[in-house]
Amino acid sequence: MTTISHPQDILLGAQAAAPVLPVCDHFSGQPERMRKSLQLQAQMTAELGRCVFDVTLDCEDGATVGQEVAHANAVAALVREHAAAHPDARIAVRLHALDHPAFVDDVARIVGQVGDKLTHVMLPKAETVDQVDWVARALDRAYGPRLPLHVLIESPAAVQQAFAIAAHPRVQSISFGLMDFVSAHGGAIPASAMGVQGQFEHPLVLRAKLEIAAACHAYGKVASHCVVTEFKDTAALAQAARQASQRLGYTRMWSIHPAQIRPIVAAFAPAATRCRSISSCCASWRWRRAACARHAALRRRRRPCATFTVR
């Protein structure tokens, strides 16, 4: 019986050394939905034997205007409660943007209180590596240990900084923010480019996605694909996830509805036939390399020794 090796144990290069993260990052911001998302994570972890998606509790899009402090307190309380019952849960938080008045409160009330229970922090609307560095220091002051940063790139200017951001040692993953990216073009990109099909066809959107993926692979970080706003047509969602994975080089993808999680996980899973093919190819290469090494060793042993005549 042939043993199938995992691709991460076979493939070489920067991405092979990247952190291993669940292939789906599920965002939820409303209190009841946040709780249900964490419950679903626990259920699927028990079902599949490992955690296959992260839950990111959303402050940026989840907090009601004027209720940001109350929302941050609720997020911290939920993290504390759920982590007590499920110590292995993978919970993250998306803060408000650096220039938002609620950013400081988010850091103090969430990272400062339950930072030890978070897997990472998502920073939206990052424009430069200097901003990323500033946020990293702010997190350190609030919590201490070095929490990984996931960075959300959402503008044409930020795309130009993708390689510099990916090179930052605290950055673990970069995500692409499609809707704000399209909006930042002031009408130059049509709304159709945000659709399940158009976002894989429009040249400027494709260029941005590829730039982010290339930056991540260059520095061993995880490229996380943007959300697809398709909830009912699972075939269309699965096709989008396969394109993100197989055409664009992304190894992770956002979801914003529970119905999206399983299709994304399935689409990003390598086919068993592909794993067998790669494993067999690499095993053959290793066998040939070992055979060449043995042959070279035998030749060295058989080489005649130099003789000297003593007069």
Model-derived segments and spans:
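Expand to "…catalyze enediolate/carbanion chemistry for C-C bond making/breaking, isomerization
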Residues: 1-311
